[in-house]
């Protein structure tokens, strides 16, 4: 069963989705990574929460520039400290 999003997660993913629908098509494909930075951000926020997911997304966006080779860069898995 899917976990419900917090209001902050909903807001963050809605803003990113708005970017995907309205701004990104005007700029064309520019992301060097797979998945794209915006998809990565949504996945990271849903998996890790708003604060940590946004931190992962920011670090990823800062790596997305012409001097970086890009490639496959999935969201890191969530560490479950209770199972260690």
UniProtKB/Swiss-Prot annotation:
Keyword Cell membrane: yes
Top-level taxonomic group: Bacteria
Name of this chain's protein: Putative membrane protein insertion efficiency factor
Pfam families xrefs: YidD
HAMAP family in UniProt: UPF0161_YidD
Topological category with respect to the lipid bilayer: Peripheral membrane protein
Annotated Gene Ontology cellular component terms: plasma membrane
UniProt organism field: Shewanella denitrificans (strain OS217 / ATCC BAA-1090 / DSM 15013)
Disulphide bonds in the chain: none
Lineage: Bacteria, Pseudomonadati, Pseudomonadota, Gammaproteobacteria, Alteromonadales
Keywords: Cell inner membrane, Cell membrane, Membrane
Main location: membrane
Compartment(s): Cell inner membrane
Record bears the keyword Manganese: no
Function: Could be involved in insertion of integral membrane proteins into the membrane.
Family designation: Belongs to the UPF0161 family.
